[in-house]
Design a protein with these regions (language model features):
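Short amphipathic alpha-helices in soluble, non-transmembrane regions
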Residues: 147-152, 180-189
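Short glycine-/aliphatic-rich beta-strand segments at the starts of folded cytosolic domains
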Residues: 126-143
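C-terminal regulatory domains involved in ligand/effector binding and gene-expression control
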Residues: 1-73, 196-205
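Active-site beta-strand/loop microenvironment that shapes enzyme catalytic pockets
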Residues: 77-123
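Conserved short beta-strand edge segments in small beta-sheet-based binding/regulatory domains
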Residues: 158-162, 189-206
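Positively charged, aromatic-enriched nucleic acid-contacting surfaces
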Residues: 61, 71-88, 163-165
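Short amphipathic alpha-helix segments
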Residues: 138-156
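Terminal, non-globular segments
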Residues: 171-178
């Protein structure tokens, strides 16, 4: 299965440029229908806005954008370029503009819609969708902190920790790195700590 970046969650941010108010929003979506539904939702919510420009990218599917009445190439295209530069898939972005009475010009509009998309993406965060190996690792307390550092070094996620006679860890690691991680634990602890592979999951985690 492929690895690809998606937005972690809904993200929203806004700014004012020469009295025009710009509100940028992004959502994670799985289908073009979901993306179009979000766009329609924003058009209804901001029916009084001057423009509701949008862009979306669906993995192995549609790439679409709209200037929604702004001069051609000044809104939707800059927004889609932000999403592409950020490497994101399964994402829809809407930038709403309330006109403030001062014209921005073509260059100013491109900069404003680029900024609107970028700050919304930053607010949403990024997650990597990939195959993760699920590992069960029981360890003595003396190794707990060192193992946490190794999990981080290998790009893993410590999902659950149980404290009893020893520490029991549930760890998710990128599929390609899990065996190297287990080998590292064996070497680091002189064989004291051994992990078990308990399954796999295909999901996204923040990066």
């Amino acid at each position: 299965m492929e690895e690809y970046l998606v937005p972690t969650a809904f993200g929203e941010a806004e700014f004012v440029e020469k009295k025009s108010r710009f509100i940028g929003r992004v959502w994670p979506v799985e289908t073009e229908e979901e993306a179009l539904a979000k766009i329609q939702e924003m058009k209804k919510q901001h029916y009084d806005a001057t423009h509701n420009c949008w862009a979306y990218i669906i993995k192995d599917g549609a790439v679409r954008f709209s200037d929604d009445g702004e001069p051609g190439g000044t809104a939707g295209m800059p927004m889609i370029q932000v999403l592409q530069r950020e490497g994101l898939n399964n994402i829809v972005c809407v930038v709403t503009r309330y006109f403030g009475g001062i014209l921005l010009g073509a260059g100013g509009l491109v900069r404003a819609y680029t900024k609107g998309a970028k700050i919304a993406v930053d607010a949403a965060g990024k997650s990597m969708k990939r195959v993760w190996d699920v590992l069960y690792v029981p360890c003595p307390y003396t190794y707990y902190e060192r193992i946490k550092l190794e999990i981080e070094a290998f790009g893993g996620v410590l999902r659950d920790t149980q404290f009893g006679a020893e520490v029991e860890l549930e760890i998710l690691l990128p599929e390609a790195l899990s065996q190297s991680f287990l080998d590292r634990l064996t070497d680091m602890t002189a064989g004291t700590v051994e992990g078990l592979h308990t399954g796999q999951e295909y999901r996204a985690f923040p990066v």
